[in-house]
């Protein structure tokens, strides 16, 4: 049975970049650094849950770790006079034994970020809001914010049912197999009294053309539009000719031949 691949991983190297950027000398070091990245992300998601963490980017050098935290509420992370971010850096340095550099990046439109939308839906379900209402409200807010399309899926014991199931809603266009489509994906879990409910969100923010040397993406899109228009015109012309030809073939029967006289009918009369 076919399954859906992670949209971000499918587009890495095409229109998206890696969330972790570093090199390892051998397999053992690679495993240690990968586990350390996982622990850092797990710690930050739990520590800064109220700030709305959308994405964590990690870069490494010799003994330094640079982190870019994309959050919805930067003030919660920074704290009064920068006290919050200094305490956060101290905790991370104690955990990793390395120098930590933290950059805070504000997420402008939270309704178009798939991870934040999924977490908001999960939080609403934990507050006993009907899951259908929470999903539909999130879809409406995303479309009003300018998203090209959105798809939401909820799995688990929805509404406290005995048997788990999956329900989803979608609006607009979400082309998962189009690599140039900017698809944002988010996942969150809602902890309820009758078990966990998984929330998946796909948001399409339009198409992104890969930049190439000497090619302007806008010019390339205009050229492709002109080519598509010419192709459609040629296709319509062919269809029109075929349609006219079919009409002529259908109306040929019963018509009088052009340019000649009607043949005379002869009758044989007996003497």
UniProtKB/Swiss-Prot annotation:
Keywords: Ribonucleoprotein, Ribosomal protein, RNA-binding, rRNA-binding. Gene3D superfamilies: 3.30.300.20, Ribosomal protein S3, C-terminal domain. SMART domains: KH. The keyword Cell inner membrane does not apply. GO terms for biological process: translation. Disulfide bonds: none annotated. Transmembrane segments: none annotated. Pfam families: KH_2 (PF07650), Ribosomal_S3_C (PF00189). Residues 210-271 are annotated as: Disordered. GO terms for cellular component: cytosolic small ribosomal subunit. Part of the 30S ribosomal subunit. Forms a tight complex with proteins S10 and S14. Belongs to the universal ribosomal protein uS3 family. Binds the lower part of the 30S subunit head. Binds mRNA in the 70S ribosome, positioning it for translation. This is Small ribosomal subunit protein uS3. It comes from Clostridioides difficile (strain 630) (Peptoclostridium difficile). The gene is rpsC.
């Amino acid at each position: 049975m076919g399954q859906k691949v992670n949209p971000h991983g499918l587009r890495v190297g095409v229109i998206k970049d890696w969330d972790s950027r570093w090199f390892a000398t051998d397999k053992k070091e690679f495993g240690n650094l990968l586990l350390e990245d996982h622990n850092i992300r797990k710690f930050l998601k739990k520590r800064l849950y109220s700030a709305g963490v959308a994405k964590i980017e990690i870069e490494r050098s010799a003994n330094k770790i640079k982190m870019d935290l994309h959050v919805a509420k930067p003030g919660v992370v920074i704290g009064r006079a920068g006290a919050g971010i200094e305490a956060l850096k101290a905790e991370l340095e104690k955990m990793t034994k390395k120098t930590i550099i933290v950059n805070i990046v504000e997420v402008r439109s939270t309704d178009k970020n798939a991870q934040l939308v999924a977490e908001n839906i999960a939080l609403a379900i934990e507050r006993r809001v009907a899951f259908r209402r929470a999903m539909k409200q999130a879809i409406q807010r995303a479309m009003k914010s300018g998203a090209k399309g959105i798809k939401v899926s909820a799995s688990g014991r929805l509404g406290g049912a005995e048997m788990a199931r999956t329900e989803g809603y979608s609006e607009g266009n979400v082309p998962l197999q189009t690599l140039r489509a900017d698809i944002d994906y988010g996942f969150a879990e809602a902890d309820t009294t009758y078990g966990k409910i998984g929330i998946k969100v796909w948001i399409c923010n339009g198409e992104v053309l890969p930049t190439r040397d000497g090619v302007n993406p806008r010019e390339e899109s205009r050229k492709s539009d002109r080519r598509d228009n010419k192709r459609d015109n040629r296709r319509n012309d062919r269809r029109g000719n075929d349609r006219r030809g079919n009409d002529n073939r259908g109306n040929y029967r019963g018509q009088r031949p052009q340019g000649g006289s009607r043949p005379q009918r002869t009758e044989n009369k007996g003497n």
